[in-house]
């Protein structure tokens, strides 16, 4: 066991000060934001909320509904070329879909097959339990090399 004796901060050490607002009403709030991504230099505009890639949430029907609000849906890892083909005619949802994957060789092959047939995906969600592992870092690097944009 390691004993750490340095001072740690907790919630009582943090002070949130509300920022003055020029808005008169909540309806004046604009949720759409534009982001420029560091590694690809691509820009994306939309509402920065992502629906999880969980069963029942990361599904094509959910994506159709959330795309109307410019919200991204991370498709579940179970989706393949056959299931994605079912929605490929709905071009309005393309900018609001993210392809989810694990980090196994089979997962990488699956996303390569999907992206070969459907190049409209702008986002890849790499979903694993431990994002601190070396394996995860290497997988992210290989995905960035294969799909730089």
Give the residues covered by each predicted segment:
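Active-site entrance/lid segments in N-terminal catalytic domains of soluble metabolic enzymes
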Residues: 1-149
């Amino acid at each position: 066991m390691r004993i750490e004796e340095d001072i740690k901060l907790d919630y009582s050490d943090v002070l949130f000060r509300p920022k003055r607002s020029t808005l008169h009403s909540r309806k004046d709030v604009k949720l759409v934001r534009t982001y420029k991504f560091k590694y690809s230099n691509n820009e994306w505009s939309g509402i920065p909320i992502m629906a999880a890639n969980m069963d029942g949430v990361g599904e094509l029907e959910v994506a159709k509904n959330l795309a109307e609000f410019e919200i991204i849906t991370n498709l579940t890892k179970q989706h393949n070329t056959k299931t994605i083909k079912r929605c490929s005619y709905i071009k309005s949802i393309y900018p609001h879909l993210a392809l989810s994957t694990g980090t196994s060789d089979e997962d990488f092959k699956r996303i390569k097959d999907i992206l070969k047939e459907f190049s409209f995906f702008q986002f890849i969600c790499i979903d694993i339990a431990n994002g601190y592992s070396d394996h995860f870092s290497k997988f992210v690097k290989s995905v960035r090399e294969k799909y730089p944009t």
